């Protein structure tokens, strides 16, 4: 008897419907076809152990299973459930008429329990698109799948529950999630707040500008100056995620298997802070399964690299394309995958290996050669892609003990949101552009054209600091953001002057140190 069940395979962020054809005839052999990987090939062993543990015998007849389309690689243990149901259907133990109405996904334990799998959200989106009556998933995946509206999602504890449901002998209700309500209920106040930061008003201003225009920023200063402390508080002044951004971000984390148990939506902007031992592949994504890397996991949020020169030069150089294109393409032998990676790049670094170059309170023990080797790990093209780089001085103890709490994040965030709304209105005609940092050269001419005085100032800065054309564009983008924070329609000379002041690493004294 031939029976068909349905599941899905996920490549990148896209799911493809997989038809599992199960045929039982006389004999005693097992055949599996359809370009299955090792985990799928091992499914029959798990199914054979699970069936007796839920009260069913494993068929001893000749069993052939085909996963179609045959030219698409099938990976992972999520095909356990649809294969097991197909075997029981072909053996006459399940009403085969109901099988075509549901998509199934889930790993089987030897005791018959359903274990969670990754990438359930893209599969749920595909099930709705293909107009299946419902999706059956492990109970631990139910909230992730149920955020897809207009699709009945059933979370099951074990194989016996699925069999009872398909035979109509058990009453199971689909999980209903009000996606919009769920999203807003999960938003919370950040625990880290800029009011904790004493002093550093100039650096806070830089971070406010960065947040307002989604600009990349690098903080340079000695140990203990508060670089990491302020970077970790940057999410608290960013605009909240929109529902569309939340769904897109959740989908990436779902594919990567990074969603926690019973998590339905990511409602906060991601803040990724990988260790400096991070590999090139872990940064961009890859492995044999073309999984998302740190640049994609930071999509719609922040990628923070603490102690930037400690990362390998190869790892840092692969950031150049994602920072420019805001997407990453991972190519394999017979397919390629594209992931979005539109993030704010935030870096911190010491000025030298010992950390105290230029610090008036500590003596630097590094030789000029050591400083040059340390800073040369950061290439000019990478630094060009960072809009703002600013020095972070140490706050003296006498000032720390006297200073009142700083301005709270909520106040700064209000100004940032006002500036972002101006940008959203400005860029409405341009698809995929929502912040000044994303402006093209043509948009710069339209929205950030400097006046004659500003142009002279820029020309002098370009000549003295030997700036690249890319740095010129970055200065204009930052100046446009400063003008938006002030509510000014035109970019003026004071905005240009402030933006030039945020190019610390372009100054000659830094250039002499090897940057």
Language-model segments: what does each one mean?
Residues 219-260, 325:
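Walker A/P-loop
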Residues 300, 306-307, 318:
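Walker B catalytic acidic pair
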Residues 18-24, 283, 387-390:
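Short beta-strand elements
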């Amino acid at each position: 008897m031939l029976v068909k069940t349905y599941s899905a395979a996920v490549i990148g962020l896209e799911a493809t419907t997989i038809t599992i054809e199960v045929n039982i005839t006389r004999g005693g052999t097992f055949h599996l076809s359809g370009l299955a990987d090792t985990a799928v090939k091992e499914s029959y062993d798990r199914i054979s152990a699970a069936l007796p543990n839920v009260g069913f015998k494993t068929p001893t007849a000749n069993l052939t299973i085909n996963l179609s389309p045959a030219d698409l690689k099938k990976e992972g243990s999520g095909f356990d459930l649809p294969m097991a149901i197909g075997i029981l259907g072909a053996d006459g133990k399940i009403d085969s008429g109901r099988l075509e109405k549901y998509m199934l996904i889930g790993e089987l334990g030897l005791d018959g329990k359903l274990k969670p799998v990754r990438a359930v959200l893209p599969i749920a989106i595909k099930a709705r698109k293909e107009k299946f009556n419902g999706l059956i998933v492990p109970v631990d995946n139910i909230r992730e799948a149920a955020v897809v509206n207009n699709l009945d999602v059933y979370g099951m504890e074990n194989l016996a529950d699925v069999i009872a449901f398909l035979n109509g002998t058990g009453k199971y209700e689909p999980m209903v999630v009000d996606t919009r309500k769920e999203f807003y209920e999960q938003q919370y106040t950040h625990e880290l707040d800029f009011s904790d930061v004493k002093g550093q008003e100039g650096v806070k201003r830089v971070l406010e500008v960065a947040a307002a225009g989604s600009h990349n920023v690098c903080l340079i200063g000695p140990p203990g100056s508060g670089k990491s402390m302020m970077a970790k508080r940057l999410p608290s002044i960013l605009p909240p995620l929109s529902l569309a951004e939340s769904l897109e971000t959740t989908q990436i984390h779902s594919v990567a298997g990074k969603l926690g148990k019973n998590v339905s939506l990511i409602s906060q902007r991601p803040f990724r802070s990988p260790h400096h031992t991070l590999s090139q592949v872990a940064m961009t994504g890859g492995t044999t399964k073309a999984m998302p890397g740190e640049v994609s996991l930071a999509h719609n949020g922040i990628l923070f690299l603490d102690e930037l020169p400690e990362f390998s030069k190869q790892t840092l150089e692969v950031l150049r394309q994602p920072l420019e294109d805001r997407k990453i393409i991972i190519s394999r032998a017979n397919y390629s995958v594209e992931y979005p990676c539109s993030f704010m790049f935030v870096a911190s670094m010491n000025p030298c290996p010992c950390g105290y170059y230029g610090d008036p309170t500590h003596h630097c023990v590094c030789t000029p050669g050591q400083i040059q080797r340390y800073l040369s790990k950061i290439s000019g093209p990478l630094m060009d892609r960072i809009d703002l780089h600013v020095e972070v001085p140490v706050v003296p103890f006498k000032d720390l003990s006297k200073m009142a709490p700083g301005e709270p994040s909520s106040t700064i965030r209000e100004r940032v949101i006002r500036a972002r709304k101006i940008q959203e209105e400005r860029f409405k005609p341009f698809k995929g552009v929502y912040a000044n940092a994303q402006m093209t050269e043509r948009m710069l001419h339209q929205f950030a054209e400097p006046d004659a005085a500003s142009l002279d100032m820029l020309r002098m800065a370009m000549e003295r600091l030997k700036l690249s054309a890319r740095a010129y564009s970055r200065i204009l983008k930052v100046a446009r953001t400063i003008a938006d924070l002030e509510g000014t329609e035109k970019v003026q000379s004071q905005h240009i002057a402030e933006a030039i002041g945020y190019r610390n690493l372009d100054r000659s004294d830094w250039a002499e140190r090897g940057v």
